[in-house]
């Protein structure tokens, strides 16, 4: 183990080296101190990696293991033995160039910016990853079966411990309390089952469609291959079946709570901030997040983070209202719609040389790039493009961008 690469919540990612051939890997360590729920969530990520492998734009796991921590116990009731805390280890490829957030940070430090052509080419790769998820077809693979077996075994152990604790608890309850607890146990159904990835494929035959949404697209979850040309989408712990119909208020609250935990706020779609009964959460959440990601690569932060900082208002209110701007646009701007080049230059320069400057200089980002972002950031999911339409929009954008507009990117030189 060489060094810590990153951390968040109960997970840590380390740079590790194979002693036999000196190969470098990323080792993700996920502490699971809360029994079945946290173990199942961690192994859900393991299973998600196997669904799409091999895909050039989606990270794959090399190996994984579940380890009991004999020194730590989950607190039980009475004198019943309780299950040991577990740690899930996931071995992943290591990418020395880091992720798009590293590129954004480098640009901010060095006062440079992302070349629009290079960004759009990378976004095409991300769209290919999303297409594999949004248009996934069921298949049977040995690796997925193995991941499910490990998940079922770990969940079974924790379920046994939970039953032991429940029996111990009942022994301390009165008859009336025990009867009420039995009724509660019978009525209680999981709103969002931990094995929802597996259950989503029940009744499906190999070849049948079964869409999934990533639900946490952001610059930090898009790695760059060692050649700097291929984006790799990572962190599949937030993966969820799509569409997800919201049929009750309790389910709406559950989905909203899960989004608050697993979907990064500045990149989270508005329908996940305020989940309504009768609505449907689908793959369009990823299109919104990808629009925020493109904006962040071009400007340095999420559009709603930027707007919230500018106005001092709530980020969530900005998201729900679709309130964002390109730098330099006034409050009457049409929700980030790209102005014409000449009009923008005239308003900025305000002198007789403005038209000449407009011919020699162009606005950044290019109007074609702005239009792609604007199409993604529609508050109504139905008004956003699907992944195929977005790929067409990006292709059109690339055809309009100057060939020499690569921009200076310090991350490309790492």
Would you name each region that the model predicts?
Residues 2-8, 13:
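Protein kinase glycine-rich loop
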Residues 12-32:
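Glycine-rich ATP phosphate-binding loop
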Residues 60-85:
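Short beta-strand micro-motifs within the conserved protein kinase catalytic domain, predominantly
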Residues 84-85, 302-381:
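C-terminal lobe of the eukaryotic/viral protein kinase catalytic domain
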Residues 85-99:
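Conserved short submotifs of the Hanks-type protein kinase catalytic core
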Residues 167, 174, 182-185, 193-197, ...:
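Activation segment/activation loop of eukaryotic-type protein kinase catalytic domains
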Residues 379-404:
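Terminal C-lobe "cap" of eukaryotic-type protein kinase domains
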